[in-house]
């Protein structure tokens, strides 16, 4: 009989950038099936829809994730002028002169992914998961795949650590994102207990802001033909 110690395999760990909205909650739900430890990180940047922080706290407890950190990054609010950081600026359906929505917060995802990378480094996590998407998105340049790949390269080189930024929703449309939540039997939770609305209305939202329009259009498409949308989701998933 051997007396040597058998080393226990290291636990797989992921850090999820978690706002409490539809996309990040869906990513969190999926991560819970794929990693031994799932750590959520939520950023308080003085956002217009501050209710999302409390929503994120509630969902983190409900889903029983390993840990949940809320980080104060209100300096971003001082630097970045946007409809999401200034109550006096109404959310517009029109693009600004630079071709971007006035809800774009410059540097937000650069800062979020940098801080999530530092947190992942300290935890010994191998992955950062974020719900950015290039298929159905609001025109934000920091939601593009090229940006994410550049950030991943910067983090790996800057910290000399193998670290992946995983974007499960990057090539999904909103209907497929709803299907993904349903695949894990969490469609009702995502629909009724997340906050995507720019005006801070939980669940189906205000129905008027761009975020609500995008969310509702995707839900309607999914509910009209669940079988077809689920099949398209399955077809989009990478094969082992």
UniProtKB/Swiss-Prot annotation:
Major enzyme class: ligase
Listed SUPFAM superfamilies: Adenine nucleotide alpha hydrolases-like
Pfam families from the UniProt entry: QueC
EC number: 6.3.4.20
Cofactor note: Binds 1 zinc ion per subunit.
Residues bound to Zn(2+): 197, 206, 209, 212
Enzymatic reactions: 7-carboxy-7-deazaguanine + NH4(+) + ATP = 7-cyano-7-deazaguanine + ADP + phosphate + H2O + H(+)
BP GO terms, sorted: queuosine biosynthetic process
InterPro entries found in the cross-reference section: QueC, Rossmann-like_a/b/a_fold
Keyword annotations of the record: ATP-binding, Ligase, Metal-binding, Nucleotide-binding, Queuosine biosynthesis, Zinc
Biological pathway: Purine metabolism; 7-cyano-7-deazaguanine biosynthesis
One Gene Ontology MF term: ATP binding
Residues bound to ATP: 18-28
Role noted for this protein: Catalyzes the ATP-dependent conversion of 7-carboxy-7-deazaguanine (CDG) to 7-cyano-7-deazaguanine (preQ(0)).
Protein family per UniProt: Belongs to the QueC family.
Name of the protein described by the UniProt record: 7-cyano-7-deazaguanine synthase
Organism (species): Shewanella baltica (strain OS223)
Encoding gene per record: queC
């Amino acid at each position: 009989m051997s007396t040597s110690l058998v080393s226990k395999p290291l636990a797989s760990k992921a850090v999820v950038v978690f706002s409490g909205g539809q996309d990040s909650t869906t990513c969190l739900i999926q991560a819970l099936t794929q990693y031994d430890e799932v750590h959520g990180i939520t950023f308080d940047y003085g956002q217009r829809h501050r209710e999302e922080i409390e929503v994120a706290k509630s969902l983190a407890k409900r889903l029983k994730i390993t840990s949940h950190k809320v980080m104060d990054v209100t300096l971003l609010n001082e630097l970045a002028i946007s409809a999401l950081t200034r109550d006096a600026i109404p959310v517009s359906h029109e693009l600004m002169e630079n071709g971007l929505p006035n809800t774009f917060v410059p540097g937000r995802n650069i800062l979020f992914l940098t801080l999530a990378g530092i947190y992942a480094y300290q935890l010994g996590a191998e992955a950062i998961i974020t719900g950015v998407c290039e298929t159905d998105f609001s025109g934000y340049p920091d939601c593009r795949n090229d940006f994410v790949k550049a950030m991943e390269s910067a983090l790996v080189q800057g910290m000399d650590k193998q670290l992946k930024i995983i974007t499960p929703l990057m090539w999904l449309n909103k209907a497929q994102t709803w299907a993904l939540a349903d695949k894990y039997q969490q469609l009702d939770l995502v629909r009724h207990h997340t906050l995507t609305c720019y005006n801070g209305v939980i669940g189906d939202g205000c129905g008027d802001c761009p975020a609500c329009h995008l969310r509702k259009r995707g839900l309607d498409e999914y509910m009209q033909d669940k079988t077809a949308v689920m099949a398209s989701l399955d077809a989009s998933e990478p094969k082992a």
